[in-house]
Amino acid sequence: MTEILDGAAVAKLTNEKTANRVAKLGKPVTLAVIYDPQNDGSRLYVGMKSKKAAALGIQTKDIPTAADATTESVLALVASLNADPSITGILVQSPLAKGVKEREIFSAVAPHKDADGLGATVQGMLFGDALDDYTVAATPQGVMTLLKHYNIDIFGKQALVIGRSQLFGRPMFALLTNADATVTLAHRYTPENVLKDYLKRADIVVVGVGKPDFIQGSDLKPGAVVIDVGMNFVNGKAVGDVNFDSVQSIASYITPVPGGVGPMTIATLLENTITLAENYQA
């Protein structure tokens, strides 16, 4: 029987621990969030993060970019936040305005303030399994927390990550590799027949491609663990990349959408923020 991985419940536990850590620190903890106010999704997401942060005792400084924002203007903003001792962590909410080079912006964030672990320095250390006191991108780290909470064995397992974005796929690949899984990274140019073969062999499948019904139960190895990072809207309803109903009869574990990875992402971002405060502001 398939067990549902309840991200909302695990996120609640994570948030309780974060709130206790914030209270114990006894100093202001502030997360600066740079975002494009023209993007409806970003505005909504930033609002959700700010509300949850406030509930945990974390202050937020939401900074909308100008309508005519350029790479240079956003880099200058990041530089000012890097130099501001009152700012604990910095989050660059993707997507930024058209024409702004996101990778340059991510990598301009000082490693000791990189709340989402997206800069080149931090991601390079992740791939070298040498993160020390830095943080990991919130979505893949949230997935790892979820797997750990449910005591899902990763060691020696065959894992398949579908999607190679800087926010999800690449750090997810590194985290699973560092946990001693044998990991395959598939992407939009992976031939369909090759992907089908990978799916049939994978013990753990983590997918985030933004395509509803991308994976069916018949694609999977019986007993596979399925982590759905996708978020799509079909007829006004939030759905993932996995056909949930068909996979339920095949998988041993599965995350629902909503209520799976999504709550873990926000909880992990705020957990990252208090970690930076403890390591670099205490």
From Swiss-Prot:
Single GO MF annotation: methenyltetrahydrofolate cyclohydrolase activity
Domain of life the protein comes from: Bacteria
Ribosomal protein found in the keyword field: no
Any one GO biological process: L-histidine biosynthetic process
Recorded GO CC terms: cytosol
Any matching Pfam family: THF_DHG_CYH_C
Binding annotation for NADP(+): G163, R164, S165
Alphabetic keyword roster: Amino-acid biosynthesis, Histidine biosynthesis, Hydrolase, Methionine biosynthesis, Multifunctional enzyme, NADP, One-carbon metabolism, Oxidoreductase, Purine biosynthesis
Pathway stated in the Swiss-Prot or TrEMBL entry: One-carbon metabolism; tetrahydrofolate interconversion
UniProt function note: Catalyzes the oxidation of 5,10-methylenetetrahydrofolate to 5,10-methenyltetrahydrofolate and then the hydrolysis of 5,10-methenyltetrahydrofolate to 10-formyltetrahydrofolate.
Family: Belongs to the tetrahydrofolate dehydrogenase/cyclohydrolase family.
Subunit structure comment from the entry: Homodimer.
Protein name as annotated: Bifunctional protein FolD
Name of the encoding gene: folD
